[in-house]
Structures are given as C-alpha cells and as structure tokens.
Amino acid sequence: MPKHHTFATKLEDLVLTSMSFRMSKHQAHPIEPEDVIREESEDFYSDEEEYKETWSRWALQLLSSSPYDLYLIVNENFESINWDLKAKTLARPLGGTMTFLFFTVRLLQDNVIKPNYHKINRTTDGFDFSRSATLREYDYFSKYQHGASWSSANWRVNSLSILDTLLKCLYILLLVSNSVLTYKFLFGYFLKYSLFHSAQPPASNNLTKKSLHDLAYRSATDVSRGSLWTLIRYTFFQRGRVQEEKPTDEFYYEIKKWCPSSFLTALFASFPPISVWFMAFSDITFVSLLPVILTQYLFWYVIFDCYEDRIKDELAIFKGMAAEYNNKVMKPKLSAQTQDAMVDATMYGQEFVQFYPSYSTARSGVFITHSLCGDVIKEKYNQRTKAFEDIPTGSHSQNIIRYSRNERLYHSVFPQNPLKKINGAAMSVNPMSFNRSPTYGGRYGTPPSRSHGSGQTYSSTSAPTSPMLKNRRAIPTDHSTGGNISGGNYVEYTSNDVHGEPPRRHSTSPLKRDITSSAGREDNHLAFGVNSPNIRSRTVDVKKNLHTHTTVVCPKSDLDTSQLSSKQSSISPFKLSRRGSIESRPPFR
C-alpha cells in the first residue's frame, strides 16, 4: 500500500492510489497504516537493528502470554499455512519416511529381537540370597551374593532389552499414527451443501432429505447413512424418536461431500494402511521391501496422480464452459453499454443535449464515497496497475456516439444544418407562443418546397414521425418521395436537395394541390408533383384555367403497380368543391 499522497490540483490527471481514508479530495490516509510505519522505520533503523528489535519483542510477548494465548498463536500459525502447496514437497517425503521407518522396526524385531527373546525376558533373580540371613550362614550360597561380574559380562543382553523397548514404542506410535491418518482421510473431511431449488432428488448416495420447518427431524435413511455410533445411539436410546420419512411440501436436500485436502491425500498415499498392516502381521525380510515399494508407488499413482489430476482436469473443463457461457450469454445481456444524457425538454429549447459517462449504473465498477469535508470521491480499480484511480470530474463527454450507416452517409453527403429538422419536416414555431404544432407551407399539410426563405425559423420540437422509404432497385432515378440515401443517384439527389433534408414519405397524396393565393385574386394552380429530385420533364401550363399540371416521365417498367395507382389516381370532386370549378381538374381514368 503506498504512502501518504498529496493529490494534484488538476482533476483531469489520474492519480494512482489505493482504497484509503479520504480527509478531502486532495488528502488521503491509508486504511492500514502498518505498512506506512514499516516504510518510515526504514529511514531510522537498519536491517540488523530491526531484526533484533523484532526478536526481542517476540520473546517478550511470548513470556508475557498465558497458555491459552500460546495455544491461539500456535493454532493461528498452523492454520495460516497453505498445506496443499506442500503436498509434494513435504507430505510425500514424510509419508515415505514413516513407511520405511516402520519397515526398519519390523525388520529389527523379526531378525534381532526375536532370536534373543528368551535371553532378554528370562528370570535372573528367582531367589535373593542376600536378603535371607539363614541362607547366608551356608558357604555354598555365599558365592551367589556377588552378581556384579555377571551384569558386566551380559551388556549385550541389556542393550537388546533397551532396543526392544524402543522398537515397541515406535511400533505402537506408527500404528496409531497410521490409524488416525486413515480415519481422518476416510471420515474426517466432509462438506455439506444444501439444495433448496432442486425439484427432483439428485442421483447421489450421500443425499439426505431435510425439513424446512423441523430442523431436528432425521429420517431413518439419514440415520442409516450416519456413523456406527449414531446408528447404535438411535437404535437403543432414541428409537422412539426416529420418524419415518414422510413427503412434505417444504423440504430441501443436503449432500455430504467427501473432500480431503491434497496434503492429507499425499500423506495417505505415501503411508498407506495396506503396507503398514501387511508388515505388522508378516515376517519381514529384505525381500519384503519389494512389495512395500510397489504398493506405495501404486497408491501414489492411482490416488494422487490419476485421481487428483482427473479432478483438476474436470475443474479446467468446467471453468472453460463457464467462461464460454459468460462470454456468449451473460456478458451480452448484462454488460450492455449505457450512457447518461441530459436533454432539454422545454418547448423553446435550443437542441441542448449533453452526454456523460455512465456512473449511475451498478455495473460501472465505480466506488463513490464522501470525504470528511463532504467532497464526492469517485474511484475505479485498474486491473492493469492493480490500484485504485481517481476519476476526473467534469462536464465533458467520455463516450463515443456511433451513428448508423444511413446517418453516416447523411452526415458525409449533406452539410450540417444547425437548425433542427426531423424526418424532413421543417417546423416554424414562435418560441414565445408555446405552440407545439408544426406549421407547414402547404394548406393541406404537404410540406412546402425545399427552397425556404431566409427569414423562416425552425423549431426544435419533434415533427410527426413517418416511415422511411427503402430503395428496392438500384436505378439511376429514385422515384421515392425525397429520395433514399441508402441507394440511388446521389449526384442528382444532392443537386436538387440543397437543404440536405432526410428522405421522408409524407402521408398526403402526390395529386393534392399546392395552392398559393395572390393578393386580390381567386386563381389557384394545382401541383401534381411532390418536389421529387428526379423529375425529368414538366408539361406546359394550362393557360385557360391557370393550373399547372406536373407529371413524371419515366419508364413504365420501373414503377410498381402501387406507385402507378398512386400517381394516376383521380381526385375526389369533394376536395375541390370549395376551390372553383370541377372542370379544372384532370379527367378521370
């Protein structure tokens, strides 16, 4: 953990720091000051002085501690060791040493102690003549009162007696150690898992059914799968309390998984009980060393190498499956890119929109805290540097807005207009009138010509949405209303559409009139075009009734039946009943 930091005044700079106690935005203190004290002490103490001080402090602490404190210290140091990493470096040599030590004990017992057993255990002091005054009066028994010469002459027998006692102690100690190791390996390490969401019972021999309401309930099946002492206790002492297994609506399954540690497995494989009990109940010679070595190697290969490697391979496969599921299913669903935005929602807004990094979501990985001064601290953990970084605060956007293909073509072909035009509808609204309805140039809702006056203003409010046309033919002439930027001739489109409005198909018929009234006259002229950029020719004006009849000249095969029926359809007489004579419209077809 780093030392005390003094952060820079520029908030844009990223400052590497750890999770710390923040006094203010520019001042932090580490949560664990022991590392800081250790680093600061290096400036005042040398390595030798620090070493002596540490040992002296440890010795003083050891002398002033109670026995229970010593027990806690030893237990904590023992549990803090990662024994699984020492399976091959410590457990295997230790188990092999114990196996060959037991072989040596049995070899000495069968070949050294057993032939001299009658000399070691014979009764040398059947009668003590020195304790009887009557026997001491006879000269014949006086020679048996001095036994010092006999004891010094039989030193070999005394040595064998001491060796026999030592071998018996080692024999019992190794047998007990192997028995405890076998019991711990087979019955000492289990983990219990509760399955609350399994509708069907899994196929497992270690599965028991538990009740959610009565925690003391144990079925007969559960008792039969317990230990021998549990079975005896329930059979003779608590037989009446054992209930039959009854199906209930609310229950769960419990699996008792056998999981010995790798260190214990390696010790069991290198000090197997089969080899120990084989040597305990058979006469041992040097030839017996061959089956002992073979048994030990076979146990190590089957139990530790094959079985442990199989578990590691299965874990690797499961991790690969989980990683594939995470990358293909979970990440696309749960890691959607988000972005915070601030948009002006007033009726007279000026298209104000601003984007911010998505810090409000739970998946952003940003830790937001407050200092003692009330400053908001935003920190994010950097996997590359393995440290926390201060996130710069500001109003600028950190995300990239990606446009679609049509939008990229539109922005690259047409110049950007600062005024807002949505779906091709240019809207004129007085900001002070709070009128949200669009104002078009045509009387019947048809948008006006693309040549707008310089004094016309546009509104930032949204226009009515209408479906975009999709070009179904890559033909030079685009007959859609306003063209289609995804296909067609862009040269003709850009030459006619000077204002760069996006393509839009309006809901009005192309045969509706575009009526322009002049001052002091009732004459109107009807437009049969919709300002398409691909009009090739126009007809002459009808001079009698002062109407303009605009038609589209194009190959007949290029138009669909729906387009022909739309462009060649007749006008209802009711539409022109209030605008003059019906004879001014084109003939019916």
Curated annotation (Swiss-Prot):
GO biological process, one term: regulation of exit from mitosis
Biased composition (Basic and acidic residues): 511-525
GO CC annotation terms, alphabetical: nuclear membrane
Transmembrane segments: 170-190, 261-281
Entry keyword set: Membrane, Nucleus, Transmembrane, Transmembrane helix
Role of this protein: Member of a perinuclear network that controls recombination at multiple loci to maintain genome stability. Required for rDNA repeat stability.
Family, per entry: Belongs to the NUR1 family.
Name assigned to this protein: Nuclear rim protein 1
The gene coding this protein: NUR1
